[in-house]
A protein has these predicted regions:
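Class I S-adenosyl-L-methionine-dependent methyltransferase catalytic core
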Residues: 1-132
Length: 132
């Protein structure tokens, strides 16, 4: 797959060592986990290898959804329109959201996560003025 044009649209596959760092304080064994902006499935692959009971995903890009369809159940395309009821059975949300929409993805995850659900997100914080 040619990722060249897609990288300009906030796609960046998460390296395995970064995923390992994201999850080093969490127990994913036997958990049902949502990856809401799954891309080509790097996080999905890692979670499955590490012992998750089930991994489900959302992905808005048609080409990426085609890649993911052989890896896990795809429960939606646009995560930001995902209803709370659709994921009421999950234990965790693990994500590396698009930089340009990271805040929206994190806040939406917080709004729809079932009680007791752990949310783990990779994100970049850019400070324009540290004093403010």
């Amino acid at each position: 797959m040619d990722y060249q044009n897609i990288f300009n649209q906030d796609f960046y596959p998460t390296p395995e060592n970064v995923i390992a760092d994201m999850l080093k304080m969490s127990d994913i064994q036997g958990k049902i986990i949502l990856e809401p902006s799954a891309g080509v499935g790097n996080i999905v692959d890692y979670l499955q290898k590490a012992g998750a009971k089930e991994v489900i995903a959302c992905e808005i890009n048609d080409k990426f959804r085609a890649v993911l369809s052989g890896k896990c159940e795809i429960v939606g395309d646009d995560f930001l329109s995902m209803a709370k009821e659709r994921i009421s059975h999950i234990d965790m949300i693990v994500m590396n959201p698009p930089f340009s929409m990271a805040k929206d993805h994190i806040l939406h995850a917080w709004e729809i996560a079932p009680d007791g659900c752990e949310i783990i997100s990779l994100s970049v914080i850019i400070c324009n003025n540290i004093q403010s």
